[in-house]
Amino acid sequence: MGLGNLLARGLGIAIGAQVGARVAHRIRPRPYPAPLRHLLDHPARMQYRDPVATLGPFGLGPGQTVLDVGCGAGTFTVEMARQVGGEGRVHAVDIQASMVEAARVRVTAAGLSERVQFHHCGAYRMPLASDSVDLAVLIASLSEMPQPLFALEELRRVLKTGGRIAVSEELPHSGYVPHWAVRNWLREAGFRYGGLRGNPFCYSLLYFNDG
């Protein structure tokens, strides 16, 4: 078999694996595998997922209460904690205990543990007071939930009137959902459109909770 055929075969296998993973995820959404959490900080991903650049359009500021839904290994949690300052608070939520622990270690190493409260739970029912959150951030996590509308209903409960929700998705993630589908979910949940940034490869939606 020639080199060209080998390359074509390898490419076909890779594409087939990607298609299979996406179909399986669409049938049965599931969290990002914890054993692969090191890939969340891979330099290739950081080319388009730099925490400062990703969070910039969401309007974080000193004194805010921010909710990191599906915090994973804390890739964005640390930067959230920096931006809310000493008077702010970050609630980091993940359904996988090992992810919560990895994020806790990371935040502690950054010297920001006093600003972050961790919750090992799902997004359908969170141990947070109603009307207590200024901003909820979901980065490649809403698409991992079997019932995204249940999560959005819970987020409406915990968000303050006038609070914001930022949903961001990226094409390399096997659970990727196009922005028009996420917009339909957010509209159905009662949020008001606030803007779209990025491109089909990696986009962010901002919506408001009008109460």
Predicted regions located by residue number:
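Class I SAM-dependent transferase core
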Residues: 2-61
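Class I SAM-dependent methyltransferase SAM/SAH-binding core
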Residues: 67-69, 73-125
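Helix-to-beta-strand junctions that scaffold the AdoMet/dcAdoMet cofactor pocket
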Residues: 84-85, 145-146, 159-161
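A short acidic, Gly/Pro-enriched loop at the edge of an enzyme's catalytic core
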Residues: 124-135
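A short SAM/SAH-binding and catalytic strip from SAM-dependent methyltransferases
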Residues: 134-146
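A short glycine-rich, Lys/Arg-flanked "PGG" loop and its adjoining helix->strand segment in the class I
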Residues: 149-164
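Conserved class I S-adenosyl-L-methionine
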Residues: 166-189
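Core SAM-dependent methyltransferase catalytic element
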Residues: 189, 198-211
